[in-house]
């Protein structure tokens, strides 16, 4: 998972640049709309909405844009484009399994765009369930400003977390997805800087990609999918050496 995690970190570092293009704000607005629609329109009483709002604020989204998205989700703002959540699955170069979460107001458009992204790198969009069995859902909490990994490990155990990965001053805490709010709230109360808390698909097995050309195609696929406005999250089970990853980033 290290290769995919490295790609995810690179993607987060580019977030503010993407936001200037409007792509990230579109994705974040949709996440807020759906979260507000599926629960209470109050971030304090809706963990999914609160997480979406915090992520939007971290990306620099204006408060009025956030409020408008919440209003759309709660039905207090005219919105003639109802969104639905869809999952796509397929195989990329080198047999890498790819799972995509999307929010769309047009299934046909989104499916066509996702299929094209796969076909351009020699991959293929598959049927529902073709790769999801290679992943498991986990709650993942991203932290920054970590100075004492041992103290954090104890806090994670107290909170009910399952695993911890630290890289420099950044860390990722893994837990049962049903305990995500509990663990994230505990860590915040303990003074840790929670950058993001979300349910993610974590690969159970990995595909090691060593060929530079194949690795380049895999990363190209990830970028193309991530740049689609309808796509919210992209997960894959590739493992690429960090040096190779950095040379291609």
From Swiss-Prot:
Sorted UniProt keywords: Cytoplasm, DNA-binding, Transcription, Transcription regulation
InterPro entries in UniProt: Integrase-like_N, TACO1_YebC-like_2nd/3rd_dom, TACO1_YebC_N, Transcrip_reg_TACO1-like, Transcrip_reg_TACO1-like_dom3, YebC-like
GO BP annotations listed: regulation of DNA-templated transcription
PANTHER family named in the record: TRANSCRIPTIONAL REGULATORY PROTEIN YEBC-RELATED, TRANSLATIONAL ACTIVATOR OF CYTOCHROME C OXIDASE 1
Entry-linked Gene3D superfamilies: 1.10.10.200, 3.30.70.980
Name of this protein: Probable transcriptional regulatory protein CYA_2259
NCBIfam families linked to this entry: PRK00110.1, PRK12378.1, YebC/PmpR family DNA-binding transcriptional regulator
Record localization: Cytoplasm
HAMAP family xrefs: Transcrip_reg_TACO1 (MF_00693)
Main location (coarse class): cytoplasm
Entry similarity comment: Belongs to the TACO1 family.
């Amino acid at each position: 998972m290290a290769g995919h995690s490295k790609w995810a970190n690179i993607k987060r570092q580019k977030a503010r640049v993407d936001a200037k293009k409007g792509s990230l704000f579109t994705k974040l607005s949709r996440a807020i709309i759906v979260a507000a629609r599926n629960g209470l329109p109050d971030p304090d009483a809706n963990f999914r909405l609160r997480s979406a709002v915090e992520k939007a604020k971290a990306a620099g989204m204006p408060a009025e844009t956030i409020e408008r998205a919440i209003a759309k989700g709660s039905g207090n703002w005219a919105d003639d484009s109802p969104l639905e959540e869809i999952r796509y699955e397929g195989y990329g170069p080198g047999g890498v399994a790819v799972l995509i979460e999307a929010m769309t107001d047009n299934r046909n458009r989104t499916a066509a765009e996702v299929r094209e992204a796969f076909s351009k790198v020699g991959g293929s969009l598959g049927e529902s369930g073709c790769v999801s069995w290679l992943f498991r859902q986990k709650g993942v909490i991203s932290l920054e400003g970590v100075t004492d990994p041992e103290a954090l490990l104890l806090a994670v155990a107290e909170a009910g977390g399952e695993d911890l990965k630290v890289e420099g001053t950044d860390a990722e805490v893994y837990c049962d997805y049903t305990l995500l709010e509990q663990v994230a709230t505990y860590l915040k109360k303990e003074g840790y800087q929670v950058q993001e808390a979300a349910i993610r698909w974590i690969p159970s097995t990995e595909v090691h990609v060593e060929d530079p050309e194949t690795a380049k195609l895999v990363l190209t696929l990830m970028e193309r999918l991530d740049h689609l406005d309808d796509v919210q999250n992209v997960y894959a089970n590739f493992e690429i050496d960090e040096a190779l990853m950095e040379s291609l980033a």
